[in-house]
Amino acid sequence: MIRFNRAIRPFSVMSFDLDDTLYNNHPIIKAAVSAQQNYLNALPRYQEQGPQYWQKCRQLAALQQPELKDNVTQWRKHTLHLALSKLGFTEQEVALHASNAYNAFADARSNIVVSDDVLALLDNLAQHFTLIAITNGNDCNLCILGRFPSCAIAYRCACFDLFHINHTCF
């Protein structure tokens, strides 16, 4: 049994993680990876590297900069630059194709389907609470959930502490 020695004040904020909380994330990630891969496979020299090339570059990126493992967005972007650079693309081509490949991933990543029941529940909760979405990859402005959260908090590192957030977003 939990015992409180002080009165608990009413809640004014409700936070939640998007992935697998409000919708099934597995098909979303699969589609996002596929969208990125489709873009990359259309580039000369990329498809010739085989299906393991992305994984090898991803592992190399993590070895070069281990802190990237704590920020999946930056890890993906760095891996894209590394993979394209290794294939001999110019700096300008690397920048262009890395950006386009990432955008293909991000657009598909934000193409989520939330059931009408969940949307109705969120509408109801938004009448009473400030809703906050915690995410490490979604762009709330690109998906249907952008109409709900007052502030989207992106996970940036393993030491991230929610108590150090700038409270002006509330």
Label the model's feature ranges.
Residues M1, V114-V118, I165:
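Amphipathic coiled-coil/heptad-repeat helices and related helical stalk/stem segments
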Residues I2-K56:
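Active-site neighborhood of HAD-like aspartate-dependent phosphohydrolases
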